[in-house]
């Protein structure tokens, strides 16, 4: 394969991220120019966000030719579909759907869809967005060794890794975690308990909230291995105010309780004791 080709001029988040994924997958240079005769027919050139054609088998990923009533999609959507990542990305990347709306419907329609004022959209910008898109737009060609190309490769690699490892993590949580009911009567709490396993993941609490969201379980709190020691972490789920861990700050086996009450750390490992601490933290 020869290159990734995208349009010159202003760059947007969708074409930038689409190119990031393609750079990470194929390691190709990027040409920023209008397609020349034959580019769309050349299987060695991946044409992104320009060219008026969506033909994945020929490496062409434009959405501008779609009718106005077409569901919101962008060049990033088309590349994710081609890579087999779209469904997971829509599930796990909350920023994707607003990106599709913004690129295909514009800022005012996107603000209406989000239920916010147009001015709020501008407040969500950062120098990271502005600088990366501006520097990308200034380039005619990018290749390995160029700082912008290397950053784009890292962005693409991280997105690939995030989607792959999160799916693996959710499967891991499903295989090991269980829901406990602790306390009695009206005082009962539903807690998702993640036991210590061997080997233990780098971040034992990773994926727990996503798993709860996917399963639809009603959960008040979480118990999970402390990655910094042999004990466990205790926390609220979705900032559930039924739990205030400052209430157990004085327990002998609790060595940390956040002043705002949303998380605590304990050296306890016995499940009965962990359940007791959750009950004592109940407001």
Question: Where are the regions that the model predicts?
Answer:
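Acidic catalytic cores of enzymes that act on phosphate-bearing nucleotides/polynucleotides
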Residues: 121-201, 217
């Amino acid at each position: 394969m020869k290159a990734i080709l995208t349009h010159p001029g202003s760059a947007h988040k969708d074409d930038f991220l689409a190119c990031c994924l393609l750079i990470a997958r194929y390691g190709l240079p990027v040409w920023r120019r209008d397609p020349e005769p034959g580019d769309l027919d050349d299987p060695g050139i991946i044409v992104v966000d320009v060219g008026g054609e969506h033909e994945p088998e020929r490496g062409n990923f434009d959405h501008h030719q779609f009718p106005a009533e077409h569901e919101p999609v962008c060049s990033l959507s088309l590349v994710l579909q081609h890579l087999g990542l779209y469904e997971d990305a829509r599930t796990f990347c909350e920023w994707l759907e607003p990106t599709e709306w913004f690129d295909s419907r514009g800022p005012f329609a996107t603000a209406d869809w989000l239920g916010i004022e147009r001015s709020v959209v501008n407040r969500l910008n950062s120098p990271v967005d502005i600088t990366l898109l501006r520097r990308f737009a200034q380039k005619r060609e990018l290749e390995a060794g160029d700082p912008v190309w290397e950053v784009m490769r890292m962005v693409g690699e991280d997105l690939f890794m995030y989607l792959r490892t999160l799916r693996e993590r959710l499967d891991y949580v499903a295989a090991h975690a269980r829901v406990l009911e602790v306390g009695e009567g009206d005082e009962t709490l539903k807690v998702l308990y993640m036991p210590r396993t061997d080997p233990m993941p780098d971040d034992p609490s990773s994926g727990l909230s996503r798993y709860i969201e996917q399963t639809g379980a009603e959960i008040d709190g979480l118990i999970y291995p402390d990655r910094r020691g042999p004990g466990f972490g205790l926390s609220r789920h979705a900032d559930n105010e039924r739990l205030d861990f400052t209430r157990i700050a004085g327990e002998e086996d609790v060595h940390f309780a956040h002043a705002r009450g949303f998380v605590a750390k304990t050296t306890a490992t016995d499940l009965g004791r962990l359940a007791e601490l959750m009950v004592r933290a109940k407001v």
